[in-house]
Amino acid sequence: MIASIRTTRRLSNYNSVIPPPEPLNTDPDMHPLKRRFEPVLLDRYPPQEATDEITRRGKFPDYVPMFAFPNDIQIVSSDDRPRSTWHGFTMTSDDNSKLYGITIIIWTALNAEVAEEVEKKCEQWRQSHMSEEERELAASLGVRLAGERTHLSQLLAKLPTIPSGSPARERLEDEISTVEEKITLMTDMLRPLRHGAASKIEGLTAGESGLWTPRAYGILGRDAANMSFWKEWLKAIVTPMTDGGVLRIPPSSPSVGRWQPLERYVVNLCTEAFNPLGSKTQVELGVRELRLYARKEADNEIPGSRSIDLYALFRCLSLENIVALFEYAMAESRIIFLSSHTSMLHLACHALANLLYPLKWSSIFIPVLPARLLSALEAPCPYIVGIERRYDRIELPEDDYVLVDLDKDTIDATSQPVRLPRQARRKLMSLLQVAAPHKLRYGVTTGPPPYAMESFPYDAFSTENAALFRSATPKSTLGKWVSQSSSGFGEPDPPNEVLPPLFNAFASAKVDNGKSDRPSTSKSGKTSPQSSVSPVSINFPPMPSTPVSRSDSGFALAATLREKRSGHFGEEKMRRSSSFGIDKHPPYHKPNLPFLNGHQANLSISAISVDSQNSVVGGGSSGGGGYGNGYAPSTYAQSTLAASTIMPSMQIQPVRNTETTVWVEGHCFNWIPKDNTSICNICNDHAEGDGIYKCTGCKIFSHGRCLGHASLVCPEAFHPDRIRAAFVRCLASLLYTYRKYLGRPSKQQKANGQLYAFDMDGFIKSLPHDQHDYATMMRETQCFNEFIHDREMQPANNASIRVFDEIIMAKKARGRSGLSTGLSRLSTIRASHGASTYGGYAPPRGSSNSKIPAWLGDTSDHIWRTASVPLPKGNFPGEYRTVVTRTPARLDRSLMREPRSIQGMPRVEGRGARGLIRKQVPSMLGTTPPT
């Protein structure tokens, strides 16, 4: 193995570059609601006293609370419960092994006693830091503000009684707009004067006090492939804790299912379940009527291709910036992601690492870097880290770094990246424009998607990981797209393979479970209000005004007061919130801008807004400005280069809304008049008689009022499998002849366990002249050296090695249609002598396309047989609703049950006397269960 010059120049040991966390230094003059508190671990499972679990699960890591709350904890003042958020994080153990975590954060109201104490502290601060005139003005504004809010609640209560579209309705809406403007003005005036909790407003303030603290529930494990599964499972188990905040959940019943205490779900996942064993088994877990399926990729698939999300990164950055970022990662730069949304950092870091396949990022990898570890940015080694925009003191390195602003689609770097060879870069861009046309041809705007901003966008249990809720596993397409010629790379998917997005997992679960009735639309319990303001200033675009007037009175009548506020006035509502770190936006009562969530009706390809939350039609980017600390604007900001200069044959189709067509998040919704039988995929209600919208791509239906809630991209507008194929094809062209230079090892190398010795100089000399400089750069990277080392140490038929070799063979076969797509020359020789061309592997089942390499097209191991984990059920002490809606700080052991056996898992071989098979118990099943 060739030593990495870049790695030897920089330190690479995790513990040598990651400093201990800085302590919290609290200013004694700081206002109580600006003060940050250090998070602590309240409880864990298995408990700390279960020392016998350490050998199997490993030592519980330090600093987990700091990664769950990377910016520590603040008390938030808000009328409504702040929005639930989620994020993933990666920790490195003492032995340099990785631990992966997913956490979901919900907000709990401070009880009256604690809230009173906080108010006393606020009053003391006001007495010592504000003049008497300021306090009087603040008190006066507070009284007037409370009066206007009460007036607003009275006006909102009248809305259901007045027909939509009538003159009286128009006058009432104008009056509501005026009151909201007054509230906005007074709130802005009050913010610099009064720093404290405003008094509770009856009918508008949820909770006992209007003061909220965050609480995190999370999972730790060693398998990154399970992170998306853990996220959806966590969303499911916290749904009852929102006490109706997640809408359109069918009510509990014996036929549908009943919620169980949190403790039983924890035992179900951590003790009764096991990790999926390759592609032969998928593990089914249940939460009420939901069924979730954990599965792994097959040996002949790209690792992470079924679990790692790419859309969030591609929605945030232009294709030009994506390729530039890929070039920086290939050169092992110090890459820093910046975003206002913690989960966006997690999604972007994992997506970038996944695109490097077959190379593996081997240096520091911290998708969410806590604020008290910011000094790690000075680490003298390559890294991929993510930092939140709201951190107080962000000090970037002096040089040699790349700052990627995910919210503004900019890359700020101290040097140009080492560019890919010209032809390889041009080809990669061409394929990406076909694989990811969501911005060029489907009008998707730039910025984080809704599911990267909060746990339940638009108060719905939607999911970007729809395959996790379907027992039928999507087909593998890697063989197809690495074998496909460039001209056929954009061919449409067969209609039966286009799976619609899942906007309500609970409703779909009811259909999948064989119920004959259509999904119910009733709310679960008391409806929690919708809020556009969260601790990280989350706000979605307003609800669109539909091109054709549609009656929404039925929806209004069914809604509660708080739902009316959100349903009629969009997401940009004004709420009373803590004035610290929360952006205020004017309310949009009657939006008249022709744009929707995830869509801008631009006629210029280059005029893509960089602010996904406030994009408008027209030229240029909105919400300008730079990073905010005086950094120079990026020279790699989103490209204005027309796609046709790279792929001349590609047809650019700017989109626009018409009277009968609406574009939302890549969906092309066409109006179907007089349709009263179709069911809206978003709210699960029937069409309202005059018609309904239908997407031409994925065939989903939507009411006009629901269009703005279509938060998931249309599968016709974004193709993650083709994107992965485009990147791996690029690397296959760069490493096309590498195996030719794996020769016999020396005696010393053999003694070290090497099966081959790589001739690096010979490999570089064999490359075309325009690739020499790039190959010389790769020679210095740890990623490439570990790629070669793996192939020196492992046989060619090892599945992890063979996947990429088969992709290279597919590249050879693309240019020569008669070429056998076997692994090497040996397979050709064997075929000429009548031997199997599959090298000892079974031929693919039903593979009729000779262009697809035999091994990549082999689906004989693509079984994913379901092993069902027993569903948590049974009676429990206490009042049902009180138990299932609580947000416990500690697990109640009395609510747990003894673990049960698993049905349908592969039989464990006997270990004792011949023929004696031990009964399976949870402690025997699987590898490294989550904590």
From Swiss-Prot:
Q: Which residues form the cDENN domain?
A: 301-433
Q: What happens when the gene is disrupted?
A: Enhances virulence of the pathogen towards Nicotiana benthamiana.
List, as start-end ranges, the regions of compositional bias called Polar residues: 521-537
Pfam families (alphabetical): dDENN, DENN, uDENN
- Map the zinc fingers (Phorbol-ester/DAG-type) to residue ranges: 666-714
Q: Name one GO cellular component term.
A: extracellular region
- Tell me the domain of life: Eukaryota
Q: Which InterPro entries does the UniProt record give? A: C1-like_sf, cDENN_dom, dDENN_dom, DENN_C, DENN_Domain_GEFs, PE/DAG-bd, Tripartite_DENN, uDENN_dom
Q: Where in the numbering of this chain does the uDENN domain appear?
A: 19-277
| Record GO biological process | regulation of Rab protein signal transduction
Location(s), subcellular: Secreted; Host cell
Chain intervals with Basic and acidic residues compositional bias: 566-575
PROSITE patterns reported in the protein's UniProt record: DENN, ZF_DAG_PE_2
Domain annotation dDENN: ranges? 435-799
Q: Where is this region: Disordered?
A: 13-32, 478-552, 566-586
> What GO terms are given for molecular function?
metal ion binding
**Primary location class:** secreted
Annotated keywords = Metal-binding, Secreted, Virulence, Zinc, Zinc-finger
Q: Which family does it belong to?
A: Belongs to the EPD1 elicitor family.
This molecule's function is given as: Acts as an elicitor that triggers cell death and defense responses in the host plants.
Q: What's the name of the protein? A: Elicitor of plant defense protein 1
